[in-house]
Amino acid sequence: MFAVIKTGGKQYRVAANDVLTIEKLEATAGDSIEFTEVLVIGEGADAAIGAPFVTGASVKAEVVEQNRGKKVIAFKKRRRQNSKRSRGHRQHHTVVRITDIVAAK
């Protein structure tokens, strides 16, 4: 069984025991979280498609760790003006493991 969940402005296709990196959530390692914004749930022809969400469906996950992504460098240079600027940014991420997919009853 799979589900498509929405979190952090993105959509993810998940199944049981999947490990995925999502935008930062306020939780610590070992916490249990639940995603209620489920867009699609099921398997094959038995898939239920929400409009926009499937009512009563949820996906349970466990937080594995909080980490940061690779550094992204934003570099600006203005030609012939001896002017340049370099800025770095590292996005915060949460790594979660999907534990259970609960279908609507």
From Swiss-Prot:
SUPFAM superfamilies to which the protein is assigned, alphabetical: L21p-like (SSF141091)
GO BP terms, alphabetized: translation
Molecular function in Gene Ontology: rRNA binding; structural constituent of ribosome
Iron-sulfur is among the record's keywords: no
The keyword Ribosomal protein is assigned to this record: yes
Family matches, as Pfam families: Ribosomal_L21p (PF00829)
InterPro entries registered for this protein in UniProt: bL21-like, bL21-like_sf, Ribosomal_bL21
GO CC, one annotated term: ribosome
Covalent S-S links between cysteines: none
Domain of life, per lineage: Bacteria
This protein's UniProt keywords: Ribonucleoprotein, Ribosomal protein, RNA-binding, rRNA-binding
Biological role: This protein binds to 23S rRNA in the presence of protein L20.
HAMAP family: Ribosomal_bL21 (MF_01363)
Family the entry assigns: Belongs to the bacterial ribosomal protein bL21 family.
Subunit text: Part of the 50S ribosomal subunit. Contacts protein L20.
Protein name: Large ribosomal subunit protein bL21
